[in-house]
Amino acid sequence: SQHEQIECWNYAVEELSIKPNPMKKTTVKGSQFEQPLLEYNGACAGCGETPYAKLVTQLFGDRMMISNATGCSSIWAAGGSAMAYTANKEGNGPAWANSLFEDNAEYGLGMLIAVKTIRTRIANNVRKALESDMSEETKAVLQDWLDNMNVGEGTRDRANKLEKVLQNEDSEIAKKI
């Protein structure tokens, strides 16, 4: 039974770290060194869809937003109480949602519009904050975020830095951001 392997599993999941990719992530070989955020799917043997879904998670990781249509992919991705998409060590993973009515294009467009609206609001607040009396360190981090807000790589690091410096600020605009 699997009970004999619980200790090994816990060690692998909790103690082993994800190694840095020695190659460019955007190459076929290099993409395979990235952590997949799709695992234990319920697809049929030989399904050609899941390798592509796994590859996309390796290329875009926790920045992915998936607007799924009801069909085979909704069954292998989220059948019953299981979810094939997973999270990294920081607890971040792809955002997955499913529309029952085969309108996932419109549903996904709504997700995109919502994200763009939120990001525009944040950018406007960042511009206001840059004109305020915040510390120079905070302003440098704010400017870096603003300059690179549409650059996917490094987004998580910039967001973490921004969150950290804003905790030291006491202004209303810092709270809004």
What are these regions (language model features)?
Residues S1-V28, N92:
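Non-heme iron-sulfur electron-transfer modules
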Residues E4-C8, A77-A82, T86-N88:
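Short acidic, glycine/serine/threonine-rich loops at helix termini
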Residues K19-N21, L59-R63:
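Long, compositionally biased charged/polar accessory segments in the mid-to-C-terminal portions
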Residues D62-S67, C72-I75:
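Beta-sheet entry/capping signal
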Residues C72-A77, M83, N98-N104:
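Short connector loops at secondary-structure junctions
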Residues F101-I173:
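N-terminal leader/propeptide and maturation segments of large enzyme subunits in energy/redox metabolism
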